[in-house]
């Protein structure tokens, strides 16, 4: 009774369900869910924003300009051109976290410092004073002669001018080599450049070593609301302990600064983006959020954050997960055409592409050159450049194209688990194998179809693939268990049948019905030692009756199963000879008659 209880199908179904649930909680099926999530993203069709353009620092640009990193006056040149073309927002993804030192810059500054403290700076005034003194004492012939020499000499005619020219040239050289100042001036003139910063993730243990610069504090979010008791539940954006902001010379002139951090999934794929990061007691927006806000003429203080819910930009509501991450929508190519057109930096600088193309556009600048950036794995591309990922994020925000995991999604998953468990425990054991296969297949396909429809039609991600895996695994294991139980029963039945046939064969043999006995022995399976022993005795009975042809048949049958049993090989040879002798003897007697 106990054995039947533990071997019943409903216990097997319950056990399989418990094991799968435990594995799910441990993340064993996350890869399956992500694979179907990526499939849903690729299958969903939306139109990307036509306001976004990309200018790429590509291989052609680096080959035609200079090796990377470029002098920042080259970045300034592009910003100046785009400003001239009337762009709406410029999103610069190149990090400017350290001052750029051009070759010779330090020497020029040393010369300027030396010039400022040396006597050269006083020479023009001294020359003027000397001239005045000579003119005042000009009545003396000797002084008059010196005055005439002085007035005609280069001391009076050129030295002061040359010193001033040298001083001016030194300052011009410093300005020409100070690419940070050139870029800062371009950013200041443009008034619409959004720069990138990087935050260092970690858990704060105290207070920061130093406060961030004022221009970073001005880019922190102030409209923070908690409508779902997120603070009590510990639902905050990801925390950081350090930051790499743009250098002050650039940061103070930027229209906005946003973080460029990404949060890859466990398999390295970038499926979602943290729209907000927490730096101690302040919250900072992503660069995609800042770019979208600027394109809508919104300042950072007009970005509203609902903890564990969403981010609001004017009339736009970007729904997020509990950590303010947006499930980015990745736009697929349309008939071979990329979702976002990428132009070469070199082509824009040299005028091959008219600036009118970028009028009122959001222009994103970033690297696509080999070895410059690190490509990211996304649901639609295994090597997408970060500037392209940013384009998808900005478009997702502006179009409100993003995937969400609904609050009831967990309940739906639990309901699917319960359905699968009840099916495996109660219904499947009552079904025949073929019917069970069809029903299981229909249920799995129903879950897949539900997942697909929710993703493609409603941009909702409900994790139903693990319950589907439970159905498939449960069906395979329970079917395998049934097969093994059936095989074990069949083996037991075969053993019982073999014993019955062996006993019948012995009974027929004792009655002298040797042919019937041989027939029963041949039905025994498996042919073990007991059956071989019985057949050996049967062969001896056939020998005694001089039915050597049947003796040979018995031994041949035995040899197929165990050629080395006793002395059957020698007896079989002797029986064959005796059979031939009998046949020859019978033939000779007939001829003599």
State what each model feature region is.
Residues 2-316, 358-428:
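Non-transmembrane functional regions of envelope-associated proteins
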